[in-house]
Design a protein with these regions (language model features):
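A short acidic, helix-capping loop that chelates divalent metal ions and anchors anionic groups
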Residues: 1
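Charged catalytic cores and adjacent phosphate/nucleic-acid-binding surfaces used
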Residues: 4-116
Length: 116
């Protein structure tokens, strides 16, 4: 196990985010101006009894938001009965981190969905 608040972990996570966003900009360029990578808030470990809170940690979500990232909520479920496990907790986490919208997948592709 590791401490996700340890300064070395935080620095590594922020460097990874910087690389993700730089790569996104390089690969998308002007063709996708205004778009941003989508990250997930995941509740799968809750349904499996491994965690009690969604992940990633709030500070990581705040770093994603500060860089202009978008989010979606996912349960990583393979069973109908856990498909929306802890989604209210994930929505609260998103709102607490400053997100007001999430991405959802529709037949037309990714669309915005308001959390408020």
């Amino acid at each position: 196990w590791f401490d996700e608040n340890h300064p070395r972990y935080r620095a590594a996570a922020c460097r990874a985010l910087d690389r993700i966003f730089a790569s996104w900009q390089e690969s998308r360029g002007a063709a996708r101006a205004g778009s941003a990578p989508i990250f997930e808030i995941n509740t799968g470990a809750i349904s499996r009894g491994w965690r009690t809170t969604p992940y990633p940690a709030p500070w990581i979500l705040q770093e994603i938001r500060a860089r202009g990232g978008q989010i979606m909520i996912n349960s990583d479920s393979h069973a109908v009965d856990t498909l929306t496990c802890a989604f209210p907790d994930a929505v609260k986490l998103a709102l607490d981190c400053g997100f007001t919208r999430v991405k959802i997948i529709t037949e037309q592709g990714f669309e915005d969905y308001s959390l408020i």
